Each structure stands twice: as C-alpha cells, then as structure tokens.
C-alpha cells in the first residue's frame, strides 16, 4: 500500500475490533529500550522515511524484538512485543503495558505478555485470523 492510498473500512475483513490502527511508541525521537533512554543510535534522524513524530519512521513497519530490546526477534518465547524498544514495537512509559487503538475506535492497554504471533494477527487487516479480546 502506498502512502497516499485510500483504504475503506470495508476492506478490513478481519473485523475492526481485531485490527490495529495506531500503536503507542513513546519517547521519540530518543531511543528507549526496556525503560531506559539510550544515547546515539540515531535511527529517528532525517531520512527518506522520516515523516514527523506522529507518522514517522514507525509508520513503515513494526514488529517484535529480542528480550533485550536490541536484537532481532528469533521466533521463540523470548521475543518481546510491548515496552521492549520504541523502534518497532508497542512502547509506553506506563507500568505494565502501552496503549493501542483498534480500527473500531477502542483503545486497549496491551500488556507485555502479548505474543508476537497475536501482534502479527492484529497488524493484518485481511489474513482471516480473528483475534479474541482474551488474547490481548
């Protein structure tokens, strides 16, 4: 999907309450990992993908990381989706989770126990994987 493409709500076939619209990624443009600010890194600097704090770098893609908030996800139980880092994942300064907005307008406080697979299902609008409220 390109930046200027229109996507009607009717194209979200997995359900508006099962699809992420926005996720919290607090602390930008600084780099945060597991509740600690890190100097350097500069991944939020001006680049072809930089579009401002509200629709910037993270509007391109997001996903889980390793438990340390730095390494890539490995596909096992140590992968982290919430409050690991503010590069790709859901990140907030709240104890026990961060906020996400679903396409139906509901705001959910998502805990760090959110599985990477459930995160992927919530990120896709038409993959046929319906996510129950108990899963996140």
Question: What are the roles of these predicted feature ranges?
Answer:
Residues 1-136:
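Surface-exposed loop/linker segments characteristic of extracytoplasmic
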């Amino acid at each position: 999907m390109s930046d200027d493409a229109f996507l009607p709500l009717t194209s979200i076939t997995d359900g508006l309450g099962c699809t992420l619209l926005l996720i919290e990624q607090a602390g930008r443009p600084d780099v945060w990992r597991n509740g600690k600010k890190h100097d350097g890194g500069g991944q939020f600097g001006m680049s072809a993908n930089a579009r401002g704090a509200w629709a910037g770098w993270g509007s391109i893609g997001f996903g889980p990381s390793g438990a340390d908030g730095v390494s890539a996800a490995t596909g096992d139980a140590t992968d982290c989706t919430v409050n690991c880092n503010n590069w790709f994942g859901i990140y907030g300064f709240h104890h026990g989770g961060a906020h996400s907005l679903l396409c139906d307008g509901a705001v959910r406080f998502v805990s760090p126990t959110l599985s990477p697979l459930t995160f992927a299902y919530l990120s896709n609008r038409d993959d046929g994987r319906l996510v129950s409220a108990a899963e996140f």
